[in-house]
Amino acid sequence: MPMTLGYWNTRGLTHSIRLLLEYTDSSYEEKRYVMGDAPNFDRSQWLSEKFNLGLDFPNLPYLIDGSHKVTQSNAILRYLGRKHNLCGETEEERIRVDTLENQVMDTRIQLMIVCCSPDFEKQKPEFLKAIPEKMKLYSEFLGKRPWFAGDKVTYVDFLAYDILDQYRMFEPKCLDAFPNLRDFLARFEGLKKISAYMKSSRFLPRPVFTKIAQWGTD
Protein backbone atom coordinates (compact mmCIF):
# COMPACT_ATOMS: atom_id res chain seq x y z
CA MET A 1 0.00 0.00 0.00
CA PRO A 2 1.53 3.35 -0.98
CA MET A 3 2.39 5.96 1.61
CA THR A 4 0.40 9.21 1.63
CA LEU A 5 2.15 12.58 1.86
CA GLY A 6 -0.13 15.50 2.66
CA TYR A 7 0.77 19.15 2.18
CA TRP A 8 -0.23 22.37 0.45
CA ASN A 9 0.09 22.52 -3.32
CA THR A 10 3.47 24.22 -2.92
CA ARG A 11 7.14 23.38 -2.50
CA GLY A 12 7.29 24.60 1.10
CA LEU A 13 8.46 22.15 3.74
CA THR A 14 8.00 19.05 1.59
CA HIS A 15 10.46 19.54 -1.27
CA SER A 16 13.16 17.56 0.52
CA ILE A 17 10.62 14.89 1.52
CA ARG A 18 9.39 14.47 -2.05
CA LEU A 19 12.99 14.26 -3.27
CA LEU A 20 13.82 11.63 -0.65
CA LEU A 21 10.75 9.56 -1.50
CA GLU A 22 11.78 9.60 -5.14
CA TYR A 23 15.44 8.82 -4.40
CA THR A 24 14.44 5.78 -2.33
CA ASP A 25 12.00 4.63 -5.03
CA SER A 26 9.21 4.66 -2.46
CA SER A 27 5.62 3.94 -3.38
CA TYR A 28 3.65 7.03 -2.38
CA GLU A 29 0.82 9.28 -3.39
CA GLU A 30 0.26 12.92 -2.57
CA LYS A 31 -2.68 14.78 -1.14
CA ARG A 32 -2.08 18.38 -2.20
CA TYR A 33 -4.36 20.87 -0.50
CA VAL A 34 -5.19 24.17 -2.22
CA MET A 35 -5.30 27.44 -0.27
CA GLY A 36 -7.74 30.14 -1.31
CA ASP A 37 -6.79 33.59 -2.56
CA ALA A 38 -6.44 36.82 -0.59
CA PRO A 39 -7.82 38.30 1.53
CA ASN A 40 -9.22 35.24 3.33
CA PHE A 41 -6.71 32.57 2.20
CA ASP A 42 -9.37 29.90 2.66
CA ARG A 43 -7.92 26.71 4.17
CA SER A 44 -11.12 24.69 4.35
CA GLN A 45 -9.74 21.91 2.11
CA TRP A 46 -7.23 21.08 4.83
CA LEU A 47 -9.26 22.08 7.88
CA SER A 48 -12.12 19.79 6.89
CA GLU A 49 -9.75 16.81 7.20
CA LYS A 50 -7.27 18.05 9.80
CA PHE A 51 -8.70 16.28 12.83
CA ASN A 52 -10.00 13.19 11.03
CA LEU A 53 -6.70 11.58 10.01
CA GLY A 54 -5.64 10.14 13.36
CA LEU A 55 -2.59 12.40 13.65
CA ASP A 56 -1.17 12.99 17.15
CA PHE A 57 -0.30 16.57 16.26
CA PRO A 58 -2.50 17.44 13.26
CA ASN A 59 -0.43 19.56 10.90
CA LEU A 60 1.01 19.81 7.41
CA PRO A 61 3.03 18.07 6.17
CA TYR A 62 2.01 14.60 7.27
CA LEU A 63 3.11 11.15 6.13
CA ILE A 64 0.93 8.08 6.57
CA ASP A 65 2.73 4.77 6.10
CA GLY A 66 0.42 1.96 7.14
CA SER A 67 0.00 2.25 10.92
CA HIS A 68 2.71 4.92 11.15
CA LYS A 69 1.42 8.48 11.02
CA VAL A 70 4.08 11.17 11.20
CA THR A 71 3.88 14.96 11.29
CA GLN A 72 6.64 17.61 11.41
CA SER A 73 8.80 17.79 8.29
CA ASN A 74 12.09 16.82 9.93
CA ALA A 75 10.45 13.92 11.78
CA ILE A 76 9.19 12.64 8.43
CA LEU A 77 12.68 12.92 6.94
CA ARG A 78 14.21 11.12 9.91
CA TYR A 79 11.61 8.35 9.64
CA LEU A 80 12.43 7.85 5.96
CA GLY A 81 16.15 8.16 6.70
CA ARG A 82 16.00 5.36 9.28
CA LYS A 83 13.91 3.23 6.97
CA HIS A 84 16.54 3.45 4.24
CA ASN A 85 19.71 3.67 6.35
CA LEU A 86 20.41 7.28 5.38
CA CYS A 87 21.15 8.71 8.84
CA GLY A 88 24.94 8.35 8.90
CA GLU A 89 27.00 5.31 9.81
CA THR A 90 29.57 6.63 12.30
CA GLU A 91 29.08 8.85 15.33
CA GLU A 92 30.89 11.68 13.54
CA GLU A 93 28.54 11.37 10.58
CA ARG A 94 25.47 11.29 12.83
CA ILE A 95 26.66 14.42 14.64
CA ARG A 96 27.05 16.17 11.29
CA VAL A 97 23.58 15.01 10.26
CA ASP A 98 21.97 16.28 13.47
CA THR A 99 23.83 19.58 13.30
CA LEU A 100 22.98 20.29 9.68
CA GLU A 101 19.33 19.33 10.10
CA ASN A 102 18.90 22.04 12.71
CA GLN A 103 21.06 24.58 10.88
CA VAL A 104 18.95 24.19 7.74
CA MET A 105 15.79 24.82 9.74
CA ASP A 106 17.29 28.05 11.11
CA THR A 107 18.28 29.15 7.61
CA ARG A 108 14.83 28.23 6.29
CA ILE A 109 12.98 30.14 9.00
CA GLN A 110 15.09 33.25 8.37
CA LEU A 111 14.04 33.24 4.71
CA MET A 112 10.42 32.50 5.54
CA ILE A 113 10.22 35.37 8.02
CA VAL A 114 11.42 37.97 5.55
CA CYS A 115 9.38 36.57 2.65
CA CYS A 116 6.18 36.53 4.69
CA SER A 117 6.69 39.97 6.19
CA PRO A 118 4.42 42.86 5.10
CA ASP A 119 7.67 44.89 5.13
CA PHE A 120 9.38 42.50 2.69
CA GLU A 121 10.72 45.21 0.36
CA LYS A 122 12.18 47.16 3.29
CA GLN A 123 13.76 44.10 4.88
CA LYS A 124 15.08 42.51 1.69
CA PRO A 125 18.26 44.66 1.24
CA GLU A 126 19.51 43.91 4.76
CA PHE A 127 18.67 40.23 4.36
CA LEU A 128 20.61 40.07 1.09
CA LYS A 129 23.70 41.49 2.81
CA ALA A 130 23.66 38.62 5.30
CA ILE A 131 23.43 35.80 2.76
CA PRO A 132 27.17 35.51 1.92
CA GLU A 133 28.05 34.78 5.55
CA LYS A 134 25.34 32.12 5.74
CA MET A 135 26.60 30.45 2.56
CA LYS A 136 30.19 30.66 3.77
CA LEU A 137 29.30 28.55 6.81
CA TYR A 138 27.69 25.89 4.63
CA SER A 139 30.68 25.93 2.30
CA GLU A 140 33.14 25.48 5.16
CA PHE A 141 31.03 22.72 6.71
CA LEU A 142 30.89 20.79 3.44
CA GLY A 143 34.58 21.31 2.70
CA LYS A 144 35.88 18.80 0.17
CA ARG A 145 33.34 16.13 1.03
CA PRO A 146 30.99 14.99 -1.74
CA TRP A 147 28.06 14.93 0.71
CA PHE A 148 27.45 16.84 3.90
CA ALA A 149 27.92 13.90 6.29
CA GLY A 150 30.82 12.37 4.38
CA ASP A 151 31.23 10.01 1.46
CA LYS A 152 27.64 8.77 1.35
CA VAL A 153 24.27 10.43 0.85
CA THR A 154 22.20 11.02 4.00
CA TYR A 155 18.77 12.55 4.46
CA VAL A 156 20.25 15.95 5.34
CA ASP A 157 21.64 16.27 1.82
CA PHE A 158 18.02 16.57 0.70
CA LEU A 159 17.46 19.35 3.24
CA ALA A 160 20.68 21.10 2.24
CA TYR A 161 19.83 20.88 -1.44
CA ASP A 162 16.41 22.37 -0.82
CA ILE A 163 17.56 25.37 1.20
CA LEU A 164 20.59 26.16 -0.96
CA ASP A 165 18.40 25.99 -4.05
CA GLN A 166 15.82 28.26 -2.43
CA TYR A 167 18.47 30.86 -1.63
CA ARG A 168 19.79 30.51 -5.18
CA MET A 169 16.29 31.27 -6.44
CA PHE A 170 16.01 34.24 -4.10
CA GLU A 171 19.46 35.62 -5.02
CA PRO A 172 20.85 33.89 -8.15
CA LYS A 173 24.44 35.03 -7.50
CA CYS A 174 24.60 33.95 -3.86
CA LEU A 175 26.64 30.80 -4.60
CA ASP A 176 29.04 32.35 -7.11
CA ALA A 177 31.83 32.52 -4.51
CA PHE A 178 31.31 28.96 -3.29
CA PRO A 179 32.19 26.41 -5.99
CA ASN A 180 31.88 23.44 -3.63
CA LEU A 181 28.24 24.35 -2.95
CA ARG A 182 27.53 24.73 -6.66
CA ASP A 183 29.19 21.37 -7.27
CA PHE A 184 27.09 19.83 -4.50
CA LEU A 185 23.88 21.06 -6.12
CA ALA A 186 24.97 19.73 -9.52
CA ARG A 187 26.00 16.40 -7.98
CA PHE A 188 22.64 16.09 -6.26
CA GLU A 189 20.69 16.97 -9.40
CA GLY A 190 22.77 14.39 -11.27
CA LEU A 191 21.59 11.49 -9.10
CA LYS A 192 19.68 9.15 -11.41
CA LYS A 193 16.38 9.08 -9.49
CA ILE A 194 16.51 12.81 -8.77
CA SER A 195 17.25 13.72 -12.38
CA ALA A 196 14.33 11.63 -13.59
CA TYR A 197 11.98 13.14 -11.00
CA MET A 198 12.98 16.69 -11.93
CA LYS A 199 12.01 15.96 -15.52
CA SER A 200 8.63 14.52 -14.55
CA SER A 201 5.23 16.18 -14.23
CA ARG A 202 5.23 15.36 -10.50
CA PHE A 203 8.10 17.76 -9.82
CA LEU A 204 6.98 20.93 -8.02
CA PRO A 205 9.83 23.45 -7.63
CA ARG A 206 7.43 26.40 -7.37
CA PRO A 207 5.54 28.04 -5.78
CA VAL A 208 7.98 28.05 -2.88
CA PHE A 209 5.51 29.41 -0.34
CA THR A 210 1.76 29.62 0.13
CA LYS A 211 -0.17 32.67 -1.02
CA ILE A 212 0.34 34.57 2.23
CA ALA A 213 4.00 35.26 1.35
CA GLN A 214 5.38 38.33 -0.44
CA TRP A 215 7.88 36.31 -2.51
CA GLY A 216 7.90 32.82 -3.98
CA THR A 217 4.18 32.45 -4.56
CA ASP A 218 4.30 32.07 -8.36
Curated annotation (Swiss-Prot):
Function: Conjugation of reduced glutathione to a wide number of exogenous and endogenous hydrophobic electrophiles.
Disulfide bonds: none
E.C. number: 2.5.1.18
Residue ranges constituting the GST C-terminal domain according to the UniProt record: 90-208
Gene3D superfamilies (UniProt xref): 1.20.1050.10, Glutaredoxin
Entry's Gene Ontology cellular component terms: cytoplasm
GO molecular function annotations of the record: glutathione transferase activity; protein homodimerization activity
Gene designation per UniProt: Gstm3
Stated name of the protein: Glutathione S-transferase Mu 3
InterPro entries the UniProt entry points to: Glutathione-S-Trfase_C-like (IPR010987), Glutathione-S-Trfase_C_sf (IPR036282), Glutathione_S-Trfase_N (IPR004045), GST_C (IPR004046), GST_mu (IPR003081), GST_superfamily (IPR050213), Thioredoxin-like_sf (IPR036249)
SUPFAM superfamilies the UniProt entry points to: GST C-terminal domain-like, Thioredoxin-like
GO biological process: cellular response to xenobiotic stimulus; response to bacterium
GST N-terminal domain residues: 2-88
Organism from which the protein derives: Mus musculus
Binding site for glutathione: 7-8, 46-50, 59-60, 72-73
The family this protein is said to belong to: Belongs to the GST superfamily. Mu family.
Record localization: Cytoplasm
